[in-house]
Amino acid sequence: MEFSVKSGSPEKQRSACIVVGVYEPRRLSGIAEQLDKISEGYISNLLRRGDLEGKPGQMLLLHHVPNVLSERVLLVGCGKERELDERQYKQIITKTIKTLNETGSMEAVCFLTELHVKGRDTYWKVREAVETTQNSLYSFDALKSAKGETRRPLRKLVFNVPTRRELTVGERAIEHGMAVSAGMRLCRDVANMPPNICNPAYLASQARQMGENSEELTVTTVGEEQMAKLGMNSYLAVGRGSDNESIMTVMEYKGAVDNTEKPIVLVGKGLTFDSGGISLKPGEGMDEMKYDMGGAAGVIGAMKALCDMKLPINVVAILAGCENMPSSNAYRPGDILTTMSGQTVEVLNTDAEGRLVLCDVLTYVERFDPELVVDTATLTGACVIALGKHASGLFSGHNPLAHELLNAGEQSGDRAWRLPIWDEYQEHLESPFADMTNLGGRPAGAITAACFLSRFTKKYNWAHIDVAGTAWNSGANKGSTGRPVPLLTQFLINRAGVEQGD
């Protein structure tokens, strides 16, 4: 899909189709009023006749509107003007793209970016339109022998902005939106891959491929032999039951003018399949445990967006690749593991494995002398129970970092909700035999998991994002969502100090 931005009057557009909004009840937007005046009341007459109410998502395609150069005009219902918010705007864009494709439009000029969306500027409206369009067109059919013929003739979409001085803002929004969309697409492609293809080595290969196309990015890997030398016994224990080698992929991006600038470190849990190990999961829905690498998929997606935008910032990303399988070599409930930090962990349940991988990685990243560390993981079912599918769980003992991430979530629409990690919750992890257990019980499960991780992050500012409820959808629309790529990327854009809106 090709995107561009322009500033012009609707009646002068020679595009195959122009897209304008109509409010409820049958009220013309400013642009629609211009068209109505030029067409001598043609559009308002249709509305009075009841052809379109203006309810959100309603569509009416007009052909050969009098005195308008464009062949077609698509009227889009936008609901009540004062109630148009981010969620409704995205839904309208999605429905518009679907209608343009279904009606055979090859190109269109979209004036919906001139609508007033509460609290949002031109940059946000254009960028969100790009991301929403790209996400609505995504499909994963690489492994189907007979690929369906989806009708998608739309090739070019032009967004109109009110004034010429906003053209630069619009172009920047398209650039950023395309980068985030590319990152989300990579995240979804990697996460949707079946576990017989997407194993830790596959994750590493995807990162290496990215490194070959970016001068700023260097990719290395740490295998099991090197992990053993480093004392990463907890990480190694989780992967011991699998024939697929555990591989930690290290991606170092150096974009800052000052190469000595401390890096931001992103860590992604990369359990490419989680059977639960000896504490075997129920069979129903176990196929979705290929998505237990959703954290790593989100991190590699954010790195893709970072490379595409060439942000002036230093970032280290760790993809903690591993597979949790039952076998005679697998680790067991009752085992006591000595982590890379020297702290010991009593294993109560082998299905609480993500934290055992992450704790060693959180110790490993100390060598980068990080500015801060953000880990993201499909860590707990408890987070899904607490927050559902809409918000990711955010945990941090550092208020400024937590607020930065929450703001990035609000800006990008990839929202998170902060939960506490008070000292009282640490008591749930006490063990009579080791420094801690790997399971805090059913109450506050997402919180106690974050408390466990916090014990390995004393040397830097840290935040944990639990994406167990947001990284993928189940049911008929099963598949990766591409989250938390928008949140992480927005956080990096803000950190880099890159100009965005007006």
UniProtKB/Swiss-Prot annotation:
CDD domains: Peptidase_M17 (cd00433)
Note on cofactor: Binds 2 manganese ions per subunit.
Any one cellular-component term (Gene Ontology): cytoplasm
Keyword Acyltransferase: no
UniProt-listed InterPro entries: Leucine_aapep/pepB, Macro_dom-like, Peptidase_M17_C, Peptidase_M17_leu_NH2_pept, Peptidase_M17_N
Gene Ontology biological process: proteolysis
Chain sites annotated for binding Mn(2+) 2: K269, D274, D292, E353
Pfam families: Peptidase_M17, Peptidase_M17_N
Locations listed in the record: Cytoplasm
Catalysis: reaction(s): Release of an N-terminal amino acid, Xaa-|-Yaa-, in which Xaa is preferably Leu, but may be other amino acids including Pro although not Arg or Lys, and Yaa may be Pro. Amino acid amides and methyl esters are also readily hydrolyzed, but rates on arylamides are exceedingly low; Release of an N-terminal amino acid, preferentially leucine, but not glutamic or aspartic acids
Annotated catalytic residues: K281, R355
Entry's EC annotation: 3.4.11.1, 3.4.11.10
GO MF annotation: an example: metalloaminopeptidase activity
Top EC class of this enzyme: hydrolase
HAMAP family tied to this protein: Cytosol_peptidase_M17 (MF_00181)
Function text: Presumably involved in the processing and regular turnover of intracellular proteins. Catalyzes the removal of unsubstituted N-terminal amino acids from various peptides.
Protein name as it appears in the record: Probable cytosol aminopeptidase
Species for this entry: Shewanella sediminis (strain HAW-EB3)
Chain's gene name: pepA
